[in-house]
């Protein structure tokens, strides 16, 4: 777990007409899968927040992620008078409303997205527009590292695990995907999945998702 902030003397950021002093920042609690992209947005000054990242490995176990996320929200809610924004998807804790229960429990704001990939695409279910039947394996640099663990399985077993999918869709948000080509080829070979397409998505979708959540957080605070 790690927390970072990018203080900028005298700097102000405006999101949809809402102005915030740099020393009064909300805290975002995010999956580590989005760390590189969020840090880049912070460095550019597109968003102005404190950022706390949980390990992407927690995705392997709903219970571990639930405990870690509960602990992080509880801690940072007390320490962040400007509010907390959770950057996890609706289904990251399960498919029975578990994430909504956590958000309601602490009365904080969450990004409008199904999962991390949906965040990168712009949220609001855009993932389902691209993959309505859940037939694609989406890979960006963070997910390439995450999926690489399948190499511990035999090729036969791995291909059986992924046999319900049609293929791989590559997502390049940072313009660095070419550096991972050998790893992409290894994953394609091990899973038996063809590479169907590559989308150079940039960071605009993620930035929009974050600004919309920051806007809702500010409105929530102004109404309280």
Question: Each PLM stretch: what is its role?
Answer:
Residues 1-20, 143-156, 212:
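Short N-terminal or domain-adjacent regulatory/targeting segments
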Residues 2-45:
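N-terminal basic/disordered segments at the start of proteins
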Residues 28-36, 58-59, 87-97, 117-118, ...:
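Gly/Ser/Thr-rich loops at beta-strand to alpha-helix junctions
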Residues 48-66, 197-200:
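A short beta-strand-loop structural module common to alpha/beta enzyme folds
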Residues 62-76:
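Glycine-rich, highly charged phosphate/nucleotide-binding loops
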Residues 95-149:
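Long, charge-dense
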Residues 130-185:
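A conserved mid-domain beta-alpha-beta active-site/ligand-binding segment of alpha/beta enzyme cores
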Residues 173-224:
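C-terminal, charge/polar-rich interaction regions
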């Amino acid at each position: 777990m790690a927390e970072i902030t990018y203080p900028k003397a005298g700097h102000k950021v405006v999101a949809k007409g809402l102005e915030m002093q740099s020393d009064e920042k909300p805290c975002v609690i995010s999956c580590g899968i989005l760390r590189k992209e969020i840090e880049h947005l912070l460095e550019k000054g597109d968003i102005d927040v404190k950022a706390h990242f949980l390990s992407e490995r927690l995705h392997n176990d709903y219970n571990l992620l639930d405990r870690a996320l509960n602990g992080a929200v509880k801690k940072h809610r007390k320490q962040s008078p400007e509010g907390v924004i959770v950057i996890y998807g609706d289904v990251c804790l399960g498919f029975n409303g578990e994430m909504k229960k956590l958000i309601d429990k602490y009365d904080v704001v969450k990004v409008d997205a199904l999962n991390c990939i949906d965040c990168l695409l712009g949220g609001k279910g855009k993932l389902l527009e691209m993959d309505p039947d859940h037939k694609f394996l989406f890979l960006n640099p963070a997910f390439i590292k995450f999926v690489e663990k399948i190499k511990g399985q035999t090729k036969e077993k791995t291909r059986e695990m992924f046999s319900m999918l049609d293929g791989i869709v590559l997502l390049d948000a940072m313009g660095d995907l070419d550096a991972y080509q050998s790893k992409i080829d290894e994953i394609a070979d091990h899973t038996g999945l063809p590479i169907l397409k590559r989308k150079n998505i940039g960071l605009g979708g993620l930035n929009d998702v974050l600004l919309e959540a920051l806007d809702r957080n500010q409105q929530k605070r102004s109404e309280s």
